[in-house]
Structure formats: C-alpha cells, structure tokens
Amino acid sequence: MAYESIPLTEEIHIDKLYTVHYFEYRSDFYYAGERHNFWEFQCVDKGSAKVQTDDDVYVLNRGQVIFHQPNEFHNLTAVGQTAPNIAVVSFECCSPCMDFFKKRILTLSDTERNLIGMIIAEAVSY
C-alpha cells in the first residue's frame, strides 16, 4: 500500500516567548503603560479592564483578548467593582498573517480560554 503525504504549512511561527503571566489585580489597579518591539496579548479571565492604545480606548470583559502589535503603546486599568484577572503573553512573531491581529479584539470560546489556561499552567511549571 502506498502512502501519500500532505505537506504542512506553518502560518504562524513564534520565535521567542518573553512573558507568560496570570495576574490577579486589585479593583483599583492602574498601569501607566509600555511599548516594546514584540507582540503581546491581554486576555480578561474575570472582571473587566480598560486598555488604552496609541489610537483607541477599549473595555474588555471576561473572555475577550486584545492583541498589541510591536511598538504599540498600551496600558491597563481595572474597571468596575470586580478585581480583574488577566493573562498576559508576549512573544516575537514575524509571520505576515499576524497582521490579522492588529487592533483586534476577539471573544474566546471556552475551549480557547482553556488552551490559554494550559499555556499559563505550563509556564508556571518552569
């Protein structure tokens, strides 16, 4: 029996991880902001947070994630009475299809949220 292979294409290749964190912030938390030459995403696991970028201000709720492209200013402020829990992952990626994520807020499914949880759990084990 002859086997036929299927070539795989790698659309997104993450070259380096810089941070993988899970923060449990206070309800009055404020971070003045930063900019750096790599990608970052912030995913709200509980509560709500306001994120200011170079161009806009967004309010993210549970299950939403925002991507920050390299050199984009971003800060973070807790919103509401519930202290927010936020996963922050920063990484280097030069794949052209990352353009899709620029200035993008996505609402994650439970499966996607669980995958981020597994990334956090693995990072904590190191």
Identify the role of each PLM range:
Residues 63-64:
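Loop/turn positions that initiate beta-strands
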Residues 59, 75, 105:
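Conserved beta-strand positions that form and line the central face of beta-propeller blades
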Residues 98-126:
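Amphipathic alpha-helical segments enriched in hydrophobic/aromatic residues interleaved with Lys/Arg
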Residues 71-99:
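Ligand-binding loop in jelly-roll beta-barrel domains
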Residues 24, 90-92, 109:
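Residues at the C-termini of beta-strands that transition into short coil/loop
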Residues 57, 82-83, 102-104:
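Short, glycine/charged-enriched secondary-structure capping and boundary segments
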